[in-house]
From Swiss-Prot:
Family to which the UniProt record says this protein belongs: Belongs to the RNase HII family. RnhC subfamily.
The record's free-text note on cofactor binding: Manganese or magnesium. Binds 1 divalent metal ion per monomer in the absence of substrate. May bind a second metal ion after substrate binding.
Catalysed conversion reaction: Endonucleolytic cleavage to 5'-phosphomonoester
Cofactor(s) this protein requires: Mn(2+); Mg(2+)
GO biological process assignments: DNA replication, removal of RNA primer; mismatch repair
Species classification: Bacteria, Bacillati, Bacillota, Bacilli, Lactobacillales
Gene source species: Streptococcus pneumoniae (strain CGSP14)
Gene transcribed to yield this protein: rnhC
Top EC class for this record: hydrolase
Protein keywords: Cytoplasm, Endonuclease, Hydrolase, Magnesium, Metal-binding, Nuclease
Protein name (Swiss-Prot/TrEMBL): Ribonuclease HIII
EC assignment: 3.1.26.4
CDD domains: RNase_HII_bacteria_HIII_like (cd06590), RNAse_HIII_N (cd14796)
Length: 290
């Protein structure tokens, strides 16, 4: 039976209780504040602030708090660089790419912090732990602003090759700081053949072999760290753009983005959209025709 112990914030505990309030059950243990009987798991929340999750579904419910099940592979237990990007699927905001260097002796610290793939963490949790990661973990962060993104897309780069360039540059600059990884993992966004094709266009190169792996953020803590820091960088950029324009900019590329894009186009013209959005997205044409 799986057993996981966590020490999340009181705010996260209350959010968990609110989400699963129908599963609350009585407990005779005086040290247990709350006890929940969930499908395939029980959750004991102690007066000390610790949480004990037990059962086959323990990992699923622990992920609510940012817990990440780490695969114990030989690669995971090596000092390695992992990279990830955030923003490529969002109309508004820039493109953030981060490379992080993590050693095995940092794994316990990262797990206790609740590091997981940024896609499973709330934005609030990401903003909370990202500053700690930036201070404790060697990394290289790059942000391509929307205006710079629009400048290079269609000229020298496309939506895939620009990511190849940023991942390569982030790794290159991190290696220049003297880190010595035994493995470099990129959260795969294209095939290895495509990556190598576009990499040939780049000036800054390194001899270390790289591995492109799908869902790498769930396998390697270094990639998970990069995912969190990149998400934080993207959110920070989005907030800065919002302050500049006076509009709330949604993440993603759905109908909410269409509506705001139309408003910005009316207020500032194409110059305004160029400042805050990736113009090659279909949202731009929808805004023009609104």
């Amino acid at each position: 039976m799986a057993s996981i112990t966590l020490t999340p914030s009181e705010k996260d505990i209350q959010a968990f209780l609110e989400h699963y309030q129908t599963s609350l059950a009585p407990s005779k243990n005086p040290y247990i504040r709350y006890f929940l009987k969930l499908p395939q798991a029980t959750v004991s929340i102690y007066t000390s602030g610790k949480i004990l999750l037990q059962g086959e579904g323990a990992e699923k419910y622990a992920s609510f708090f940012g817990y990440q099940a780490v695969e114990q592979t030989s690669g995971q237990n090596l000092p390695l660089i992992g990279t990830d990007e955030v923003g490529n699927g969002s109309y508004f905001g820039g493109l953030a790419v981060v490379a992080a260097f993590v050693t095995p002796d940092q794994h316990d610290f990262l797990r206790k912090l609740g590091v997981g793939d940024s896609k499973t963490l709330t934005d609030q949790k990401i903003r909370q732990i990202a500053p700690i990661l930036k201070e404790k973990i060697q990394h290289q962060a790059l942000l391509l602003s929307p205006s710079k993104y629009n400048e290079v897309i269609g000229d020298r780069y496309n939506a895939v090759s620009v990511k190849v360039a940023l991942h390569n540059q982030a790794i290159y600059l991190l290696l220049q700081k003297g880190v010595q990884p035994e493995k470099i993992v990129i959260d795969a966004f294209t095939s290895a053949k495509n990556y190598d094709k576009y990499l040939a266009q780049e000036t800054n190169r390194f001899s270390n072999p790289i591995s492109l792996e799908e869902k790498a953020e769930g396998k390697y803590l270094a990639v998970a760290v990069s995912s969190v820091i990149a998400r934080d960088l993207f959110l920070e950029n989005l907030e800065n753009l919002e302050r500049e324009l006076g509009y709330q900019l949604p993440s993603g590329a759905g109908t909410a983005s269409d509506k705001v894009a139309s408003q910005i186009l009316q207020a500032y013209g194409m110059q305004g959209l160029n400042f805050c959005a990736k113009l090659h997205f279909k949202n731009t044409e929808k805004a023009k025709n609104a």
